[in-house]
Amino acid sequence: MSSQSIRLQQIIARGFASVAAGMGSLLVTAALVWGADPVGPAAEGFKTIPPNKTLSTDTKKRLEIEGLVRRIINGAPLTGNETIFDGYYASYLFPQWTQTTEEDLKALPKERDKFIKNSMELAGAKNPTAHSRLLDLSHTKLAEVAQDPAFHPAVRYNAILTVGLLNEAEPNRGTGIKQMPEPYIKALVTLLEELKKPGNNEAVRVGALLGVTRHLEWDNSKPVGSGKRIPPAMRNDAIAELTSIVNAKVPPAGRSMEGQTWLRRRALEALGQAYALKVEPDFAKLLSSIIGDDAEPISLRCTAADVMAHVEYPAAALPPISPMAKELGYLALFACN
């Protein structure tokens, strides 16, 4: 990183710290985050998939099947047990996630976390064959739920969040061997489709945005030329959609101005991941224009300042130091008044 770029980031960091210190209760934290699902009240009239009747009513049989699945996840041979393995997830576990009682909906975040840790991550470490099979199966089945408007919004949101968490290579937690997660590239296709879909459910679109952000974030850890990075065309598609969200100042019908600002901030953060290693001139101009625009919401301007502090500027995209420091000073004063 050049000395100019380092100096700019130091100025931005100090300026943003002043802004953050003075904001207090002015910034509203959105409810739609990874651990706070919009479950809402239980409601009738939504589509559900009945879980396998035998496993739902015969405890002994269910425990037997779950024991076999756990053994496979932990390294036992999958060969000869594919039908049972697939059926447990496709006909029992995932259908449970479509139920709409209040208890079922509230349990979705916990069940999602348990599935990722105890099935996906564990299989990735213990049984690559089972992991690969479950990866494809999970993406297929959960994408179907996320894309179907007949399901409860919370059910669809949970499904698209899980799609966004799927990895081709899982992190090696607690093994002492450093392994960064490699998000499942096929899932990114689904995430972008749901993010771009006109009139899509708001919760599904937010879940897709969070998933796209995660893909862009972890893409930065993949070596250039490794063949594992997001294809350029797909990356450009994501950047174009995210930029359009950031530039959309007027909310569509049914969305509040606060909700629109929140969505713009998340899209701006996602772009920060896309440009974390090298800021392009167009993105540098976008950040500077938001920071210096008094008509923009203060929370969005602060997000732009925060993003600017965490990306690397090459010489061609580096904004003038003095004017930018001045804009950040104005932003700090405005936020603290």
Enumerate the predicted regions with their spans.
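Short, flexible loop/turn elements at secondary-structure junctions
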Residues: 22, 161-164, 210
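Long, helix-rich interaction regions
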Residues: 31-107, 146, 150-155, 168-183, ...
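Acidic/histidine-rich, surface-exposed loop or edge segments in extracytoplasmic proteins
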Residues: 93-96, 113-121, 140, 144
